Amino acid sequence: MKRKLLIVNSNLHTGGVQKALAALLANIGNDYDVTLLLFYKGGACLGELPDNICVKEVNSAFRYLGMNRSDAKSPKDKLLRAIYAGITRVFGRKYAIALMGLGQKKLSGYAYAISYIQNGGDKAFYGGCNEFVAKHVGAGKKISFLHGDYRLCGANTALNAALYKSFDAIAACSQGCGDSILAALPELGDKLHIVKNCQRYDEIRARAEKTAVRLEPEKINIVTVARLGREKSVGRAVEAMARLGALQEKIHYYIIGDGIEKDRICGIIDEAKLGDTVTLCGSMDEPYGYIEAAELLLIPSLSEAAPMVIGEAACLATPVLSTETSSAREMIEDSGYGWVCENSVEGLRKGLEMLISEPDLLREKSKFLNTLHFDDSEAAGQFKAMLDRL
């Protein structure tokens, strides 16, 4: 008989955590009796789930933690979501969750219960899966996944620490993420497991072929795929390119994504007169054609955990240049996928200048990536080994 496994997540809107979850389910669905419980049953990644996964939605106010503003369509949902968000921002998430839990029946009968997305700060209207699994699920063993840098994402609070201590295991998606939480909570050392993200590489390659584009053949084409938020710091990449002088003529930079920083980035482009060098492409559900066509994937983030786009680029033979973040050296330099630079505008400038001045470095790295074999056997094996050890 297959062991019963409950995985709790907020929603399946497009994002790194959601893509990793869909890929994990594709790899483990035949080995366990899996129920995926979503706070809000919506999002583009719903269509990527295998048929053997039972997908349910909570029947309580926890659903508002899974909704974004556009999901709340009825007047009732808009009002209640606003009320819970307001309580969270004024008094803290624990008070909102206490109210949400009043109508939530306890679930039981599972060998393992997994909270797949971490919390943010105590007043961030985000997460809640840790609390749900800890307080509203009965299971033999409980596991919390960590997809962020614990010390830098706002999660390093007494409330979150107490929650993590209540779990039987913590699954960090990279060694860097694991090291970050252990630096704050060393007592969790015996509970920590490294479980890398699954990626479904064959699907990535197929989608790249389906969405193929032709970029400027006489240029070094550089692409960034990111939400345009402050932590992604895409504006710094544009500032670095403004400092390249005559080397600007050798490149074209494509920014795929949208967000609150878009207007500021447009201002930097205009001020630096980079309109012919930088193209804002907007959000794309399928950026893989651009990634494959580019000579370089650029990650200019102030902070990152283990971005899925690194593996996506590597399996498409596109080298990566990233600022130094918690997992960058582990995932990019140690793997041979590319280069890591100082986390600053000047560090980005130097890294770009080196690669633009010596394009053979990019060509040789791409050839190397083409020799590698990419599959999810290691990541799926780590997940299964963790469950077997508990």
What spans do the regions from the language model cover?
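Aromatic "clamp/platform" in nucleotide-sugar-dependent glycosyltransferases that forms part
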Residues: 283, 302
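A charged, aromatic-enriched C-terminal amphipathic alpha-helix characteristic of glycosyltransferases
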Residues: 360-390
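Short hydrophobic beta-strand element within catalytic cores of glycosyltransferases
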Residues: 319-322
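N-terminal strand-loop element at the rim of the active site
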Residues: 7-14, 27-94
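Acidic anion/phosphate-binding donor-loop and adjacent secondary structure
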Residues: 154-155, 179-183, 193-219, 289
